[in-house]
Each structure stands twice: as structure tokens, then as C-alpha cells.
Amino acid sequence: MVLLESEQFLTELTRLFQKCRSSGSVFITLKKYDGRTKPIPRKSSVEGLEPAENKCLLRATDGKRKISTVVSSKEVNKFQMAYSNLLRANMDGLKKRDKKNKSKKSKPAQ
């Protein structure tokens, strides 16, 4: 997995979307990041220790290539604006789901 800066992550994410435009999927995950790269040992778990600054870890993959970035709380507004514009621009290939007729199954159970 490649850890990139925020701007580089957005450009690589755009490339992933362009590559998967005709066929394929891009999976994006977002989670809280505390700065650790190793797991916490079970016996000495530190529950009261909070990081000085909250961070978010974003990961994106198309199944073959993985990219990730860490966004600090100071730059989250700037990143979110650029990220939302990127998502709006690249989610034009979505298909509407076929809604099944629910009237057949709507009888109340007695």
C-alpha cells in the first residue's frame, strides 16, 4: 500500500476512477487513525491515551492497486471540498436500481 500526501492521493484517485470508468469498481474506506503502525498488545492495552490530534485514514483500491493517505484535522475542510468535487465528477457512471413491486408482499400478517 502506498501512503501519499493529500494532493497526490486525489490525483491518483482520479486516475483510478478513469481506469475503472468502463468496467470495474473503486472501493474507498475511511476510518479514524491514531498514528500507530503496530497493533496494541492485549495485556497492556492503553484505553485512556488519546492522540494529540485527530486524523483520518483514507484508502482506495481497484482490486489491484492500493493507495492511502492520512488527513489531519487542520486540513480536513480543504481536503473534503476537493474530495467531494472529485466524487461528484466521477460518479456519473452509476446505474439506477430496478425497484421491485412491493404491493404483492404488502399484505399484513395476522
From Swiss-Prot:
SUPFAM superfamilies: Signal recognition particle alu RNA binding heterodimer, SRP9/14
Highest taxon of the lineage: Eukaryota
Biased composition (Basic residues): 96-110
Keyword set includes Glycosyltransferase: no
This protein's UniProt keywords: Cytoplasm, Phosphoprotein, Ribonucleoprotein, RNA-binding, Signal recognition particle
Gene3D superfamilies xrefs: Signal recognition particle alu RNA binding heterodimer, srp9/1
Subunit structure: Heterodimer with SRP9; binds RNA as heterodimer. Component of a signal recognition particle (SRP) complex that consists of a 7SL RNA molecule of 300 nucleotides and six protein subunits: SRP72, SRP68, SRP54, SRP19, SRP14 and SRP9.
Sequence similarity: Belongs to the SRP14 family.
Protein name as catalogued: Signal recognition particle 14 kDa protein
Gene that specifies this protein: Srp14
